[in-house]
């Protein structure tokens, strides 16, 4: 938000859908392992398969620089561990939990802990933050629930990544530094109750690539990839294939490094926070309505802080919208941590180390990216927007300046929903330098009809920003000229070096009738499969 300065089988994605964007979302993203056990009416002792490994942002969503999605807190590879020396259930039937990551306390009520520490859960009714007793130290305090799992459960295994899509799996396994034989196990996207073994491979034809093997479950509880070799547990299956190729493309050698996820919220009960708890450290940028800072919360935690000029929006309206925004949890959305709700309003979010996508493309490492990386970034943005679409929400200001980048080309959508609250007369009149005319669908710019379909139009403009490395849309045209020409049917021509098939997707996004524009679900599917289904013969050029 701000001033504009000049393959497993997947079900078919729905290409078109009517707009119903006036519905307010009532549910949040539940995360990779299903709902919290408290929502399902379970006690901690019963919590063995549901949401005990990282939720919502796992394993993509680490704090930017150095903890970033696709990077990982632990850069060293870990050998496979099959047996845990400590039993999960001690006398009395109490389930013990084990820490999956290190955590440094952010408040006096938190517990610091190290990966492998064990806990007894005292109270898990809060969902995101549990009261626990450390078995290692005997101390009581709060811990982030997505940092622990029941001891000896599958969720506590290094190699188990839970509900991770095939595409995100390949992004992780193909990161630089991973070698042939790097692997993970995840839930199957297509078969309920089954798992997938995903493995990094190499051959002369494809180079580095990933293979995926379905792990099926027997009625007696066993597991197999092929029926001739069956195992009583997933742990035994993993152990076998680390010792024997036995039909796989390569032996399992190293576990794919996990990424420390974002906690859900900055701390327990830290939502409306005092201004004094924030320190503004480095100003990262400024726009018409405020500034963005790298800062520190409570002297312990690096965050991003957006400061809004007084009068930009009503504090009451902002707080109401922020309550919705904080429930929109997805690994391709920048999480909202906390707010200062009195003017000047402060918005506290995850810090993303590479800054905005626009700056990254124009002045950062993005200048040197080729089409495969740019299309992958676009597919990540479409993934986040498809979630916003499912939640019946609207962004209203989708453009490269409002996408943030972390290490390893991870993209997250920022500032969703804020544009609706701006009270500046020049902005609300949808004219002048403060309003992003060049990114806005004609029905929204002319008549104020903002829907998810106007977001689709904006996404088409964002695609041009990606392939031109941050060029301002409609070069050589002023805002009024853009409005007039677009209303008459003008559309930007295919950018230099851009494949015609990608330009055709842009043109689909720019259909005059909103309901004729594709859904974000369809756009995501198109982009994720682009180099297998649409442009399999792609060869790198000078620019793309």
From Swiss-Prot:
Pfam families (UniProt xref): PK_Tyr_Ser-Thr, SH2, SH3_1
Residues where ATP binds: 284-292, 306
Domain SH2 span(s) in chain numbering: 159-256
SUPFAM superfamilies xref list: Protein kinase-like (PK-like), SH2 domain, SH3-domain
Reaction(s) the record says it catalyses: L-tyrosyl-[protein] + ATP = O-phospho-L-tyrosyl-[protein] + ADP + H(+)
Residues of the active site: 397
Protein name: Tyrosine-protein kinase Yes
Source species of the chain: Xiphophorus hellerii
Name of the encoding gene: yes
């Amino acid at each position: 938000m701000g001033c504009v300065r000049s393959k497993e089988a997947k079900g078919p994605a729905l290409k078109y859908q009517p707009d119903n964007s006036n519905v307010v979302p009532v549910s949040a993203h539940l995360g990779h392992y299903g709902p919290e056990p408290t929502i399902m009416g379970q006690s901690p002792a019963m919590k063995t398969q549901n949401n005990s490994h990282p939720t919502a942002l796992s394993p993509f969503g680490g704090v930017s620089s150095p903890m970033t999605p696709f990077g990982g807190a632990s850069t060293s590879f870990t050998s496979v561990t099959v047996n845990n020396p400590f039993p999960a259930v001690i006398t009395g039937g109490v389930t013990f939990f084990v820490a999956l990551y290190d955590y440094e306390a952010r408040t006096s009520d938190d517990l610091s802990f190290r990966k492998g520490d064990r806990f007894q859960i005292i109270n898990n009714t809060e969902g995101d933050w549990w009261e626990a007793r450390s078995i290692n130290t005997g101390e009581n305090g709060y811990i982030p629930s997505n940092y622990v799992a029941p001891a000896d459960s599958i969720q506590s295994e290094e190699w188990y990544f839970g509900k991770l899509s095939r595409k995100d799996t390949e992004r992780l396994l193909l990161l630089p530094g991973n070698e042939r034989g790097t692997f993970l196990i995840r839930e199957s996207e297509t078969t309920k109750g089954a798992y997938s073994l995903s493995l990094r491979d190499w051959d002369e034809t494809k180079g580095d690539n990933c293979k995926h093997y379905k792990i099926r479950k027997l009625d007696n509880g066993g597991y197999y990839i092929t029926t001739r070799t069956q195992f009583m547990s997933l742990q035994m299956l993993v152990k076998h294939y680390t010792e024997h190729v036995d039909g796989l493309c390569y032996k399992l050698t190293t576990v794919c490094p996990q990424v420390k996820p974002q906690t859900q919220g900055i701390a327990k009960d830290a939502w409306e926070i005092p201004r004094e708890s924030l320190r503004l450290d480095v100003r990262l940028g400024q726009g018409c309505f405020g500034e963005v800072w790298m800062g520190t919360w409570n002297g312990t935690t690096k965050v991003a802080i957006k400061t809004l000029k007084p009068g930009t929006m009503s504090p009451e309206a902002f707080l109401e919208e922020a309550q919705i925004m904080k429930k929109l949890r997805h690994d391709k959305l920048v999480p909202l941590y906390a707010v200062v709700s009195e003017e000047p309003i402060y918005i506290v979010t995850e810090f993303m180390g590479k800054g905005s996508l626009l700056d990254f493309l124009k002045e950062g490492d993005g200048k040197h990216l080729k089409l495969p990386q740019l299309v992958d970034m676009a597919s990540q943005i479409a993934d986040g927007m498809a979630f916003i679409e499912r939640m019946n929400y609207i962004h209203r200001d989708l453009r490269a300046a409002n996408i943030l980048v972390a290490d390893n080309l991870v993209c997250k959508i920022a500032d969703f929903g804020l544009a609706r609250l701006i009270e500046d007369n020049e902005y609300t009149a949808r004219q002048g330098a403060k309003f992003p005319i060049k990114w806005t669908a004609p029905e929204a710019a002319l008549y104020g009809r903002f829907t998810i379909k106007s977001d689709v139009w904006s996404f088409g403009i964002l695609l041009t920003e990606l392939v031109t490395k941050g060029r301002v849309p409609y070069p050589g045209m002023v805002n009024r000229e853009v409005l007039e020409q677009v209303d008459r049917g003008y559309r930007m021509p295919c950018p230099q070096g851009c494949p015609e098939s990608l330009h055709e997707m842009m043109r689909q996004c720019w259909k005059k009738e909103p309901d004729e524009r594709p859904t974000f679900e369809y756009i995501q599917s198109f982009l994720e499969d682009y180099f297998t289904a649409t442009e399999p013969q792609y060869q790198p050029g000078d620019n793309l």
